[in-house]
């Protein structure tokens, strides 16, 4: 309360749990989750978010899943109307392809951010965007930079996860890939000592070095994690260290 200007609020539209409209995406907890990027759905998603959060504007709204079933022009028109109405300030794309960024821009859009998976272990999809993001002055916001925790420490890599835990199904649980990660941690350890940082902070700093308008989307549950993460903002990796990593 009374601190709205101290925060940047970002949420998403297009995937809805209303059991109606759009294309079937998945089912969970008795709900049918549909992907709908039509103007009426985008408007409802945003207005529902405003009501639930108790605010009169959102700083950033991300189209959660770009959908080719509905006209890009309709989606862009809805988002631009919401900007004019003052309900959102900016908007972006997620789960997309570089061609989608071009399509939104060519339809008269002003895409401020692209949110995609990107890490030192999985950099390829993200790198496809960088030239276009520079062209359109777009922020690249990465999630997954710590690979579900597997890049935080060698000890984390040895943990066992229940079959219902998403971390049990990612590639880095494979024994052969674990061995590769162990070698990476050995290479990175002297760099952590030199830069006085954790493994997590080092790979976050690496991500920031890849594009000059990079934003990190990092999950945190402890104050200590927040304190550790913000250190990456002050680290300037040398070119030879980036190459080494």
Regions found by a protein language model. Give the residues of each.
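Beta/alpha (TIM)-barrel catalytic core signal, keyed to glycine-rich beta->alpha loops juxtaposed to Asp/Glu
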Residues: 66-244
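Short, acidic/polar
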Residues: 35-53, 97-103
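A short acidic, glycine/proline-enriched capping/turn motif at secondary-structure boundaries
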Residues: 14-18, 68
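N-terminal binding-site loop/beta-alpha segment at the start of enzyme catalytic domains
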Residues: 1-12
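Active-site groove signature of glycoside hydrolases
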Residues: 50-71
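Surface-exposed, active-site-proximal loop segments in enzymatic domains
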Residues: 18-35
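Active-site-proximal beta-strand/loop segments in catalytic clefts of secreted hydrolases
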Residues: 12-14, 145-146
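Active-site acidic short loop of glycosyltransferases
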Residues: 4-5, 55-56, 88
């Amino acid at each position: 309360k009374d601190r709205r200007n101290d925060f940047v609020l970002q949420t998403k539209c297009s995937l809805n749990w209303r059991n109606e409209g759009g294309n079937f995406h998945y089912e969970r907890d008795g709900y049918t989750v549909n992907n709908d990027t039509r103007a009426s759905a985008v408007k409802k998603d945003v207005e529902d978010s405003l009501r639930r959060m108790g605010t009169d504007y959102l700083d950033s709204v991300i189209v959660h899943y770009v959908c080719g079933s509905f006209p890009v022009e309709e989606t862009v028109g809805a988002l631009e109307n919401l900007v004019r109405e003052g309900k959102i300030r900016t908007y972006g794309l997620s789960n997309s392809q570089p061609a989608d960024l071009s399509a939104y821009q060519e339809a008269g859009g002003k895409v401020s951010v692209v949110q995609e998976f990107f890490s030192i272990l999985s950099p390829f999809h993200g790198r496809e965007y960088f030239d276009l993001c520079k062209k359109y002055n777009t922020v690249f916001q990465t999630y997954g930079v710590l690979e579900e925790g597997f890049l935080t420490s060698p000890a984390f890599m040895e943990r066992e996860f229940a079959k219902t835990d998403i971390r049990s199904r990612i590639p880095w649980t494979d024994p052969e890939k674990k061995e590769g990660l162990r070698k990476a941690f050995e290479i990175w350890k002297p760099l952590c000592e030199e830069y006085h940082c954790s493994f997590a902070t080092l790979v976050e700093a690496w991500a920031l070095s890849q594009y000059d308008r990079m934003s990190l989307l990092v999950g945190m549950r402890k104050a200590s994690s927040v304190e550790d993460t913000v250190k990456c903002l002050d680290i300037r990796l040398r070119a030879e260290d980036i190459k080494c990593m």
